[in-house]
């Protein structure tokens, strides 16, 4: 059975496999350039959870086995995709007539990055050879002349390689990063919903004053976690709601919110027959980026008039708007169901929602209210109407049909 078919029918079993076992289940089990095994393995990496990618990378570094280097190469390139780069996979085995690069990471707003992956720096790295790859790729018009070079190394103790880069003529064109810190960058991106985070990450990967960027990433990672733990959105009282009382401002554990979000997204993906990967804290998409989901979670507030409240941010709006089939998922902490509002419906009704618009931040208010029959609806506060959510409801059963 092809690996992706096995994944769809036996997800839990695949997640228990080591990366060696996963590769052996792909095609004939031997990764070669242009092989079916390579196609299946790379296809699987596109849809597997980020946490599995992290574990696979660490397995390659902690265990000695055949082809660990080329497996790590594919994993590192997938980490690049999780950072929203357009990635061109390189060759497993170099050829005289073909440039033997490991990967090219591209983005619309930043220079290209030529990536070289090394499991260790015990073996001398030829900086001249990497630079030659860059020159040949530019001659073939496959990268821009201002492209930089990034060496991704398995070991964190890379002092000798750092000194080699600093003392070379490539000091301002090349940077180093360990696999573990590349993993941290993906974690930072997936914990954040701030679009500037991705911009900052890309700037870190480009040449600047420091040769190795691990310590800077550590600081950013710690800061991001601290900020996330302090975040608590408090809903404003909507117009016309003041007579129904105020809200008790109790914070909900971020881990509980995250678990509920994943629960809702996975249930919706199953019902739709889709494989979704995390783009950021609340955003998810398919490997081809056409199917997109934004999932917000609300605790249960006191009173029935406005029991749930969500902020809908402009960057979420852009993300969903750029997809072909997009949904805004409204999940409730105390319910085993959620509501998948098609983006077309939300976009049509945004103008009827209250909005906070400040210089530093803006967002629409998505306040849920209770209907006479006990079901929920979005309160279209500006026009005094309600958008019933019952047509968009789905439960946690895998057999449940999504709207």
What is each of the regions a protein language model found here?
Residues 121-132, 159-162, 299-321, 338-341, ...:
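Active-site-adjacent loop/helix micro-motif of nuclease/hydrolase catalytic cores
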Residues 1-70, 226-252:
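Interdomain/boundary linker segments immediately adjacent to catalytic/signaling cores
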Residues 288, 296-300, 330-337, 371:
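Short, flexible beta-strand-to-coil junctions
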Residues 175-272, 279, 339, 344-403:
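Non-catalytic C-terminal interaction segments of nucleic acid-processing enzymes
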Residues 65-70, 74-225:
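Catalytic core segments in nucleotide and nucleic-acid processing enzymes
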Residues 48-91, 241-289, 299:
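Acidic-basic catalytic patches of nuclease active cores, encompassing PD-(D/E)XK
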